[in-house]
């Protein structure tokens, strides 16, 4: 009789526990579904701003538009630098250079932008001819910035390529160069800029040096290779110049906050 009395109680306890577990599972499923709905709602509510008036005006000067990937090797560099011919004014230069990425590659750009803006001011105020008449060896003869194509990342994100070209008075010491800079526009907002191409050099015989920067740009980021060569005028036993070479390999990732250096190292 005791066994018969306990059996109904055991069955009742088992059913109660089963119902409790089912309720917990349903609650968890409902909670998960609710979280997914909230996440989807937040994603749908992201508002992409319109392009600023300054950017709209600037983009009227673009030469072409390319999809990624884009190869900026020696051949691509030559074609690109020849195709970039629409001059940038001081306001546009300041807009594009306002957030240069803190990186080894942009040290040269920062310095050139300072000289570029000073030269633009001379030309605007009518003092450029007087400046040319006062040129001496080693002085900057001219420097200009020009608008290039855009590289399309997606509907609301792209890179603006622009060029700085400069040269000194034609005597030793002499220097000249072409810089290609990429400015990132992410979801219609201008973020920052970084150097992606360079061909430059200078000499004060027998000392000389040159630099080349080429890049491969795809939907994930930019891989840049910088090659520096220099000679201090020294020769080996056979009379050949002793040339020092250094190669730096960098990967620049782009995200909603702008360009970010992911890795950097010396290859040689």
Region locations from a protein language model:
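Structural signature of eukaryotic scaffold interfaces centered on beta-propeller domains
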Residues: 146-154, 213-218
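C-terminal motif of bacterial Sec signal peptides marking the signal peptidase cleavage site
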Residues: 15-16
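Terminal domain-start segments
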Residues: 26-148
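Positively charged n-region of N-terminal signal peptides that target proteins for export
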Residues: 1-5
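Short, surface-exposed coil-to-beta transition loops
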Residues: 143-146, 166-181, 195, 207-212, ...
């Amino acid at each position: 009789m005791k066994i018969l009395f306990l059996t109904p109680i055991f069955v009742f306890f088992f059913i109660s526990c089963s119902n409790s577990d089912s309720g917990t599972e349903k609650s968890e499923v409902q909670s998960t579904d609710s979280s997914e709905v909230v996440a989807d709602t937040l994603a749908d509510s992201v508002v992409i701003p319109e392009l600023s008036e300054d950017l709209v005006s600037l983009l009227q000067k673009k030469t072409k538009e390319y999809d990624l990937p884009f190869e900026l090797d020696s051949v691509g560099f030559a074609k690109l630098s020849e195709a970039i011919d629409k001059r940038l004014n001081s306001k546009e230069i300041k807009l594009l250079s306002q957030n240069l990425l803190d990186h080894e590659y942009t040290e040269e750009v920062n310095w050139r932008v300072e000289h570029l803006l000073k030269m633009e001011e001379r030309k605007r105020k009518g003092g450029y001819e007087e400046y040319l008449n006062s040129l001496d060896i080693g002085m900057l003869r001219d420097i200009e910035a020009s608008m290039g194509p855009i590289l399309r990342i997606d509907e609301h994100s792209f890179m603006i390529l622009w060029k700085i070209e400069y040269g000194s008075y034609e005597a030793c010491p002499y220097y000249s160069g072409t810089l290609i800079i990429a400015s990132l526009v992410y979801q219609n907002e201008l973020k920052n800029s970084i150097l992606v191409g360079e061909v430059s050099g200078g000499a004060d015989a027998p000392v000389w040096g040159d630099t080349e920067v080429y890049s491969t740009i795809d939907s994930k980021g930019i891989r840049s290779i910088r090659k520096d060569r220099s000679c201090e005028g020294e020769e080996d036993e056979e009379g050949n110049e002793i040339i020092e070479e250094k190669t730096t390999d960098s990967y620049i990732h782009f995200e909603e906050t702008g360009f970010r250096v992911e890795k950097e190292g010396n290859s040689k």
